[in-house]
């Protein structure tokens, strides 16, 4: 069977997971472009993450997206990690290679930047302070992508200021942490 005729199975892995709309979106595009495949929810608790990730190849999956709370933990199970994902310290996408090797990527920041550029073609990261809400895995990726785009000042707001300060301490020197709703 040629690769183009092969049924492709993928999904989104996390816990909780059923609130994710990813299967609706991915299955729409699979159908629209006539790609033989399906995309579903994979509810996996942290204690079962390694077994689930290592089982992707054996089950014949093309890969999966990774979401809370697994973005950092799943990195340890990859055979290869994209350089950008290494810098971000988290992955959100696993691709199963033909030889069964697991390749980890992070496209959170790229997706965010592209969305902003699509909505505001004249946008420039260095035009003024940028506000980022949250300090989790996606925020980490977005902040790094903003820095790569030339942002001079990023204001990070999180419910717990210690989490925001933790993100800043990792490597982002031109961030300022703020408690929710204060001195933005």
PLM features: what roles do these ranges have?
Residues 154-171:
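NAD(P)-binding Rossmann-fold cofactor-contacting core
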Residues 17, 137, 161:
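Short, glycine/serine-rich, charged loops/turns that create anion-binding
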Residues 14, 106, 116, 127-147:
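Glycine-rich adenosine-cofactor-binding loop
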Residues 148-153:
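Conserved S-adenosyl-L-methionine
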Residues 2-121:
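Phosphate/diphosphate ligand-binding glycine-rich loop within oxidoreductases
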